[in-house]
Amino acid sequence: MSSDEKGISPAHKTSTPTHRSASSSTSSQRESRQSIHVLERTASSSTEPSVSRQLLEPEPIPLSKEADSWEIIEGLKIGQTNVQKPDRHEGFMLKKRKWPLKGWHKRFFVLDNGMLKYSKAPLDIQKGKVHGSIDVGLSVMSIKKKARRIDLDTEEHIYHLKVKSQDWFDAWVSKLRHHRLYRQNEIVRSPRDASFHIFPATSTAESSPAANVSVVDGKMQPNSFPWQSPLPCSNSLPATCTTGQSKVAAWLQDSEEMDRCAEDLAHCQSNLVELSKLLQNLEILQRTQSAPNFTDMQANCVDISKKDKRVTRRWRTKSVSKDTKIQLQEGPPAKGQFNTTRRRQRLAAAVATTVPFSATMSPVRLHSSNPNLCADIEFQTPPSHLTDPLESSTDYTKLQEEFCLIAQKVHSLLKSAFNSIAIEKEKLKQVVSEQDHNKGHSTQMARLRQSLSQALNQNAELRSRLNRIHSESTICDHVVSVNIIPSPDEPGEQIHVSLPLSQQVANESRLSMSESVSEFFDAQEVLLSASSSENEASDDESYISDVSDNISEDNTSVADNISRQILNGELTGGAFRNGRRTCLPAPCPDTSNINLWNILRNNIGKDLSKVSMPVELNEPLNTLQHLCEEMEYSELLDKASETDDPYERMVLVAAFAVSGYCSTYFRAGSKPFNPVLGETYECIREDKGFRFFSEQVSHHPPISACHCESKNFVFWQDIRWKNKFWGKSMEILPVGTLNVTLPKYGDYYVWNKVTTCIHNILSGRRWIEHYGEVTLRNTKSSVCICKLTFVKVNYWNSNVNEVQGVVIDQEGKVVHRLFGKWHEGLYCGVAPSAKCIWRPGSLPTNYELYYGFTRFAVELNELDPVLKDLLPPTDARFRPDQRFLEEGNLEAAAAEKQRVEELQRSRRRYMEENNLEHIPKFFKKVIDANQREAWVSNDTYWELRKDPGFSKVDSPVLW
């Protein structure tokens, strides 16, 4: 190979002209950055990671004094530890796009704790849309002041940055320098980020850990290591130590493995110091043979013409950057083959006379330390009159062999130390596990004793209360026996309702639970008879729902109301002899094979109430029964009717308004039946003390009206439903007001409903959402108002179904704060001392198989044989398609649904042809105070039901 080919790199020789022209600047800068890496990371052996040397960088090496040259930013100096935490810095810079893309693009950068993140805009950073992240502590940073350029080399990529103004450039350089030093200091100090810092990188024996090892009587003292804490003596142990602690102390004092490990580490450290010296000698010996003069190289570089640069690239004989990869020769050296001390002295003398001190510090490619030097220049090695080439080669080989032997010793010592630590680790695990096992047994025994003591006390208290109840029950001999439902087969059978005793048991249970449960007032349940489905389902649930610290012990208004209605025969139609059902006859059908897109694609943005749906998408309830389902927690209104504080009454009414939405949480997979015009529904609940009826008063637009009355309250509403399908979701927009009156205080509350949205209509798991604002007002008093907000789920808010509200007095001051979730409960106050106002009851078993119905919803469509003669023929319980779906007969349900809808269309056509108008039977239209049409009860339903009965009243044929 000719002399001209010696300085030509392989990359220059093999690169094509096209590739060279596309990325000439990028490849040259990448080569420069790689050279800078080698400059900052001093060549190390395989046992010392390069990152530790990169973090502890030498003084900055200016590449040129001119303003247009690159300058390497210095890193953390050895011994520099007091780096203050920098402030966060952000702003826009220009970033050069990676090859093959071109041009500078504006990006927003954020520098925080040594990490440089960038994105297109500040909003993207807030959203977490980061385009890239750079650890400036592990990057090589170089700047070019004249061009206002900043380059960050992370080994994987080179980031080219540019700043428009000089002030911004100086600010960014200052901040990057500070963050870089801080990040490097954190990496050195943190064992997690710098696990390779086992031994301090020092060059003097005084500062090395090996110097801290003391030898007494020929044995190594482990306490001399700075990282090893002194072993505790027996005198330092407390007198009341447990057996496990004594075992730990004995293990710490008697263990020999740790002493052996400390001794191995001491020898290993000595060998490492020897390896470090050998490595320096190897580097010195290698550079004494090939180190050129910087002045000559710069002069030669200037004289090179452009024509010479275009000469075809040739391969270099050997890359100088690979000098760091020392080729170790296998096999130990022969005895007496060389003298290490004499060879080191000769090498030191040669270095002192010929090699500059700066050249002895880093064995790198010389053009890397100064980019102004040409990388392709031929370096002529000056003749050396101090060292013989053959002798230097022999010394170099012997140093390599010695280096290999000592490295093998270090490896074996480290392996032995690791085995010792592993043995001690297993011992410590056994001791700690035994200690934890004993401690766990003692803790469990203490808990069992405490639980047993509490159970004994509770048993004694319950026995005393049971005796008191028994004694009082024997005194109270009179029992109200009412023949609620006479049976034709057994005319003498009666259902005995022991009102005084049941009321007494309820009061006792309320007392016992209020002592052990935290304060909250939930839906009040009155334990009356075996006909209550909640009592049969779960006694504990009825007790818990009856708890309230604010309920007086002599509060018997609901019980008196129910007993009065039972005695007067007003609620006989709702009494079920065998109790209410707890499960539907058949589970819900599979709807996975229904293609909703074919049904809904032509109805986007339209009202879906006019679109006929497959019966499989329905649930065996209709909208009129849904209105009754909102009365599930009517006990909140009963409680409000007994609360004197107007602010607390408003809180209870607000809780009732929220409770009407909880049953919809598991019902997103199906929709209720649309009532036909003139359809009705009634519900009498003796256990809750109310009677309810509803009617479909209009078909286009669909309007449903209902009325519910009790001794403590009157509730009514008329709702107009509007359904909108938007492709992936469906919105249900209710229009109307809800009304509640409390006769005892003369209060009249009104409020509105919020928007309901069902997501993932066509695919995925459907889920329901309620959002909007609700304003509750007492039109008879301006003492306070309540504002509730059903929070809408958005991209940045992960909390779903949240409800927030406040009760405000006349002056606008917040009296009560409300918060919670509409499917979990509502709380009043500030957490964690907030008081639970309402909490939903438990769901029945396998509710997901039965349309997600609650216990109350399961009972709504139940038809007792005795009720058939008492209900009007327009009642929803008689609707055939709904009944077939409940029983699981899909074919019959689909056929009946089509027949019922066609029958309604024919009635509408007949009325339009004859100019007839439908007149609701049980509701009338009025104009309220807001000049809005409203539907209220005409007070004829219960009168007709009582006399002469619906069987004797003409009713339209709906199915």
UniProtKB/Swiss-Prot annotation:
<dbReference type="InterPro" id="IPR041680">
    <property type="entry name" value="PH_8"/>
</dbReference>
<protein>
    <recommendedName>
        <fullName>Oxysterol-binding protein-related protein 6</fullName>
    </recommendedName>
</protein>
<comment type="function">
    <text>Regulates cellular transport and efflux of cholesterol. Plays a role in phosphatidylinositol-4-phophate (PI4P) turnover at the neuronal membrane. Binds via its PH domain PI4P, phosphatidylinositol-4,5-diphosphate, phosphatidylinositol-3,4,5-triphosphate, and phosphatidic acid. Weakly binds 25-hydroxycholesterol.</text>
</comment>
<keyword id="KW-0446">Lipid-binding</keyword>
<dbReference type="InterPro" id="IPR018494">
    <property type="entry name" value="Oxysterol-bd_CS"/>
</dbReference>
<feature type="compositionally biased region" description="Basic and acidic residues">
    <location>
        <begin position="30"/>
        <end position="40"/>
    </location>
</feature>
<dbReference type="GO" id="GO:0005829">
    <property type="term" value="C:cytosol"/>
</dbReference>
<keyword id="KW-0963">Cytoplasm</keyword>
<feature type="modified residue" description="Phosphoserine">
    <location>
        <position position="35"/>
    </location>
</feature>
<keyword id="KW-0445">Lipid transport</keyword>
<keyword id="KW-0597">Phosphoprotein</keyword>
<dbReference type="Pfam" id="PF01237">
    <property type="entry name" value="Oxysterol_BP"/>
</dbReference>
<keyword id="KW-0967">Endosome</keyword>
<dbReference type="GO" id="GO:0010008">
    <property type="term" value="C:endosome membrane"/>
</dbReference>
<dbReference type="GO" id="GO:0008289">
    <property type="term" value="F:lipid binding"/>
</dbReference>
<comment type="subunit">
    <text>Homodimer. Interacts with OSBPL3.</text>
</comment>
<dbReference type="InterPro" id="IPR037239">
    <property type="entry name" value="OSBP_sf"/>
</dbReference>
<feature type="modified residue" description="N-acetylserine">
    <location>
        <position position="2"/>
    </location>
</feature>
<feature type="modified residue" description="Phosphoserine">
    <location>
        <position position="290"/>
    </location>
</feature>
<keyword id="KW-0539">Nucleus</keyword>
<dbReference type="InterPro" id="IPR011993">
    <property type="entry name" value="PH-like_dom_sf"/>
</dbReference>
<keyword id="KW-0007">Acetylation</keyword>
<feature type="domain" description="PH">
    <location>
        <begin position="86"/>
        <end position="181"/>
    </location>
</feature>
<dbReference type="Pfam" id="PF15409">
    <property type="entry name" value="PH_8"/>
</dbReference>
<keyword id="KW-0813">Transport</keyword>
<feature type="modified residue" description="Phosphoserine">
    <location>
        <position position="190"/>
    </location>
</feature>
<dbReference type="GO" id="GO:0005319">
    <property type="term" value="F:lipid transporter activity"/>
</dbReference>
<comment type="similarity">
    <text>Belongs to the OSBP family.</text>
</comment>
<feature type="region of interest" description="Disordered">
    <location>
        <begin position="1"/>
        <end position="60"/>
    </location>
</feature>
<dbReference type="InterPro" id="IPR001849">
    <property type="entry name" value="PH_domain"/>
</dbReference>
<feature type="compositionally biased region" description="Low complexity">
    <location>
        <begin position="14"/>
        <end position="29"/>
    </location>
</feature>
<dbReference type="InterPro" id="IPR000648">
    <property type="entry name" value="Oxysterol-bd"/>
</dbReference>
<keyword id="KW-0472">Membrane</keyword>
<dbReference type="GO" id="GO:0005886">
    <property type="term" value="C:plasma membrane"/>
</dbReference>
<keyword id="KW-1003">Cell membrane</keyword>
<dbReference type="GO" id="GO:0005789">
    <property type="term" value="C:endoplasmic reticulum membrane"/>
</dbReference>
<keyword id="KW-0256">Endoplasmic reticulum</keyword>
<dbReference type="GO" id="GO:0005635">
    <property type="term" value="C:nuclear envelope"/>
</dbReference>
<feature type="compositionally biased region" description="Polar residues">
    <location>
        <begin position="42"/>
        <end position="53"/>
    </location>
</feature>
